[in-house]
Amino acid sequence: MAAPAQPKKIVAPTVSQINAEFVTQLACKYWAPHIKKKSPFDIKVIEDIYEKEIVKSRFAIRKIMLLEFSQYLENYLWMNYSPEVSSKAYLMSICCMVNEKFRENVPAWEIFKKKPDHFPFFFKHILKAALAETDGEFSLHEQTVLLLFLDHCFNSLEVDLIRSQVQQLISLPMWMGLQLARLELELKKTPKLRKFWNLIKKNDEKMDPEAREQAYQERRFLSQLIQKFISVLKSVPLSEPVTMDKVHYCERFIELMIDLEALLPTRRWFNTILDDSHLLVHCYLSNLVRREEDGHLFSQLLDMLKFYTGFEINDQTGNALTENEMTTIHYDRITSLQRAAFAHFPELYDFALSNVAEVDTRESLVKFFGPLSSNTLHQVASYLCLLPTLPKNEDTTFDKEFLLELLVSRHERRISQIQQLNQMPLYPTEKIIWDENIVPTEYYSGEGCLALPKLNLQFLTLHDYLLRNFNLFRLESTYEIRQDIEDSVSRMKPWQSEYGGVVFGGWARMAQPIVAFTVVEVAKPNIGENWPTRVRADVTINLNVRDHIKDEWEGLRKHDVCFLITVRPTKPYGTKFDRRRPFIEQVGLVYVRGCEIQGMLDDKGRVIEDGPEPRPNLRGESRTFRVFLDPNQYQQDMTNTIQNGAEDVYETFNIIMRRKPKENNFKAVLETIRNLMNTDCVVPDWLHDIILGYGDPSSAHYSKMPNQIATLDFNDTFLSIEHLKASFPGHNVKVTVEDPALQIPPFRITFPVRSGKGKKRKDADVEDEDTEEAKTLIVEPHVIPNRGPYPYNQPKRNTIQFTHTQIEAIRAGMQPGLTMVVGPPGTGKTDVAVQIISNIYHNFPEQRTLIVTHSNQALNQLFEKIMALDIDERHLLRLGHGEEELETEKDFSRYGRVNYVLARRIELLEEVKRLQKSLGVPGDASYTCETAGYFFLYQVMSRWEEYISKVKNKGSTLPDVTEVSTFFPFHEYFANAPQPIFKGRSYEEDMEIAEGCFRHIKKIFTQLEEFRASELLRSGLDRSKYLLVKEAKIIAMTCTHAALKRHDLVKLGFKYDNILMEEAAQILEIETFIPLLLQNPQDGFSRLKRWIMIGDHHQLPPVIKNMAFQKYSNMEQSLFTRFVRVGVPTVDLDAQGRARASLCNLYNWRYKNLGNLPHVQLLPEFSTANAGLLYDFQLINVEDFQGVGESEPNPYFYQNLGEAEYVVALFMYMCLLGYPADKISILTTYNGQKHLIRDIINRRCGNNPLIGRPNKVTTVDRFQGQQNDYILLSLVRTRAVGHLRDVRRLVVAMSRARLGLYIFARVSLFQNCFELTPAFSQLTARPLHLHIIPTEPFPTTRKNGERPSHEVQIIKNMPQMANFVYNMYMHLIQTTHHYHQTLLQLPPAMVEEGEEVQNQETELETEEEAMTVQADIIPSPTDTSCRQETPAFQTDTTPSETGATSTPEAIPALSETTPTVVGAVSAPAEANTPQDATSAPEETK
């Protein structure tokens, strides 16, 4: 197997290169945004740039990046575009810029939407250019650029401007391009289309000739483009050299065809045109397919196109076709061929009279039709309306190979999509893992096209939706597997031994050499299948490794996935491995197969089962694991061995590799998706079309649902009637009681429900009444029934005063339908979610709600807030891992809940015993839940009924107040409640108290009745299943857990009515969809009533490690984001309470009307300034340190030493002023920088109690969903903006801080970036040097924005700050030390021991020696040992590559007068204890 060539990484230009470029000089003259006086527009500039910069460099990405980054499209090209100045260079320049925007994944159409006037003219010229001759004005490379532009247009149908142009190309009139017989056949199939067709012809006759000609050109555009492509394809030779321009053109064209076929609006009309052109037949017979190297990607794309042309869907209705309907279509085709053969071709009688199953294979079709002449084959095809009729006495122009393939490919039996899927192995093999077209490397630049499905806005059917996600999920996990295999195998250093075998010169934690491998079982296939039901094997390894690694291997659990690898190295012993060269050649990798652990075998060869029992201790170091192999893969390998004489793969394995369990769940998720595709997915009717991206996007909104609920109990949502009125601005609120004293929460609100259907009323007065009625809310205060006399009986209440948009979100979430809540940072998303859950729980006690989040952290936050509301904890259940991080003492996991139920049962039975004793009833009523039930029925109820009969109303007179207390039968039981129980003020009040007491007693027995099942079910597993299926009302899990455990949940009969998803914009499309189907449908219908998604699509999307899947396939698009793009109505929360208003301004431009809650203006912490710092936020410019800005010791492992040291110096400065270290977090945009900063902190101040460590040092991506008071942010890059150009990352970075944000960056680079302008224009309005107030301690009373009374110091650069902090620390130590001496008169012994450092200092003679000691306690600025972080696998690098070395000389002195570090601290200098003294280095001691 040929190893893939290592692709080159595109190096982004540096700032100095950008400034030196000709383009930049032109930009500064004509269009740069920061230039005030610009030169007038000159068309020649565009011509020159296109010819000299773009064409001359063969469309080099670097040049196009520069142009696009300089805002060439926005500020020059489109701003000045008009038909008068349009030219080839102008058109091509715009197309290049748009394509580059798509490649960079930044919004491309905004500028066109702002100035749409000339777009139709521009688009028509693009169409004209795309059809131009390849040897004419437009070269093939230029036409490939145009094809890519058109592909982007067809994939942007959600943009009105684009859609209006594209619709003219793809609609029913495009069938003009069909041959007449085929057109008649299609119109006959769908009769209603003939009516439209006649109407189109009639309208065409009314058009003037010029407009008609223009319309005809647009309608025939795609037909002509196909013909043009076929001519280019035919010009590719079989073996002679071919230009790559031709190959790329063909690949891009097929990509365009796939995208047109995979979208229903375009497919509906285009599929017939494509079929009539026989494009697939031409392609499969072309020379390009036969060229192995050049045509490999083309062939893969062609297979995708073939799949979509035959997709199981009715093009006109959009309905998915069933297996039976597909079979019927196939039979109809064969029988029509047989009828034509019988009627007109006597030589085909045998074929015509055979049954379908005999003749519908490729072999039999070739046998019958192969002997026929070309003319006869043409006639057969014309009878089927596949080709135009052949005129008499004329020979066909098509060759025989084409005609035969046309008939055979059309009529051969196809394997169904679901069968193909079921026969597919789930584990990747070496052929897929290292195929660059399917699993590209990390260096994917976005230039070429790939044989990958795309996730856009719409899907053909649910099967198509699941299949695309299945393939992408499989390939994304394959990419990660490839990285793991390459890492583990290269660490093992496989070399060829002297005798030709394998010898391993290294070792790997995650891989072991295999000692023996045996297949032990191949089970019989199921009926109708040709692969075994089960294949098991035994793998023996020798665990001669450290104990903790041995424990990891022995800890492999059932269902863990491992990989079996065969290597046959050709390199001799001792050869060095070079990571920059292709991996496969170096290690000699031959095979990779996946397997799933069943268990480890004991001494007797039996599988050791997972369970609570301790594992047996096995002797020796040899361990054998029983594994399941993939039956489909095994079948394919065995067939290959038997039929083709290939070697038996299963006798060659010599390495087994395991993976981290957290990253190794791909097989379970793939199995879940495959199971979904094999079952009838019943998505609720009201969601089906929205999920596929069709129909009215607002159809699932509660206002359009037929089962809208008029009256809702808002429980404790409102704090007062004023809060309620403020929550519905523009509504007329009518309260059913007039007494203000009674207008207290909780409230029931009756909303006016509009029925969707109704007669139109013409009377204006009636309309006014309607509007008035529609805005009237009827509010009914009600009293929660008394729950008992104990303080804990009182319900917990919400204390948050929700805003009116939050109330709208809560209202929408309580109503049936789809609710989408967009929650910007700090707007209370979690509080809204919790209130919705609580309100559903109280309004619909019989319903069950499923909570799904992206992370365990979010789930824990939800649970902690749910606990604070009035929800009975016995109804809460948490599935999956992560509950150990919950900051509550309660365990909500399955077994935690089982233990809670058992403990609660004992508590309640004790209460029953106490009640029994108080009533003087003999016997043992509290023995079981059952006996307690009988006790309640015969002893408690009888007494209560007797009591009620005594105290109830007798006629018109009320009973005496004292009677309520006198006759009460449970006085003794309630003796431990706060006394007196009865107030004696009124009969109604005392009667309510009595009923409350009885409710308390009744609740005991109700709970015992529920817990009775735990007496009958004996095992913990059965009890936990019962809890899940019957008891729990609110069930929470992560999306990953849902995907892994769907099969088990469905098998248990798990049911739920509502789903609430938090962090919905961070969840993968497929992981959002699976939770909808965790239950089997009832009578063919889903019982799902509500789907609430809460997220923020302006923050970071799901994490996809491979750039190709992220960008090309758009796999990072969450379902939430797609719904927003499609136009599903959202509730946008619009008031934040996290950050200062000034900090909020840095990101609120990204949201609709995001304002601040009142407390952000009023609370002292928000109005007070940040002590010691002049500004609450500041952008600090960091220039190169020692001539180095960003460095990249490994690909994409970016570091910036200057910024890292500066950030740490500011952190230390803040801590020295008195800021708590845990209130400061340090964020950066790259992993490399994160590791470097951590190293510097460890070195400088990590173990110093005076300073300590910040709360977190992590990346912006990892910190999403968290916050802290003060954020120090390092942007790292100095050559190119990098991935901060994604505005979503910028929003996350800017919105993590509550009180202070300090950003360290190369300002000249970031201020020019168009996407970042709204934030950076505010940041650059303030000085770019750090302004500090060293004499102002924390906390301060100075108001934010006030001029300080202390002196402000301006820090110009990092060395200055480092030295300043160093001196400040030294001053603080000396002052503290002096203060201690005056205050503490220590005993002589302690002075001797505790002031070792001071004694040393006094003995030293020179200032220089004194500084040496201090520098031992605080590493001096010449100490650079932590300068540059490099990962463990770093290859040898020179100082110039890494930016610094570990020698003291690498960083010169930062100041003449002080020892010059980038100065910071490793231990406090007031070493008053022996322990502190020992922390100094050895030399000092």
UniProtKB/Swiss-Prot annotation:
InterPro entries for this protein: Aquarius_b-barrel (IPR048966), Aquarius_insert (IPR048967), Aquarius_N (IPR032174), CWF11_fam (IPR026300), DNA2/NAM7-like (IPR045055), DNA2/NAM7-like_C (IPR041679), DNA2/NAM7_AAA_11 (IPR041677), P-loop_NTPase (IPR027417)
Ranges for region Required for assembly of the IB complex: 417-1485
Record field: catalytic activity: ATP + H2O = ADP + phosphate + H(+)
Effect of residue 1196 to A: Strongly reduced RNA helicase activity. No effect on ATPase activity. No effect on spliceosomal pre-mRNA splicing
Domain of life: Eukaryota
Annotated stretches, region: Helical region with structural similarity to ARM repeat domains: 1-416
Record field: compositional bias (Polar residues): 1421-1448
Gene3D superfamilies with a match to the protein in the record: P-loop containing nucleotide triphosphate hydrolases
UniProt domain comment: Contains an N-terminal domain with structural similarity to ARM repeat regions; this domain functions as a scaffold for protein-protein interactions, but is not required for RNA binding or for ATP-dependent RNA helicase activity.
Protein name: RNA helicase aquarius
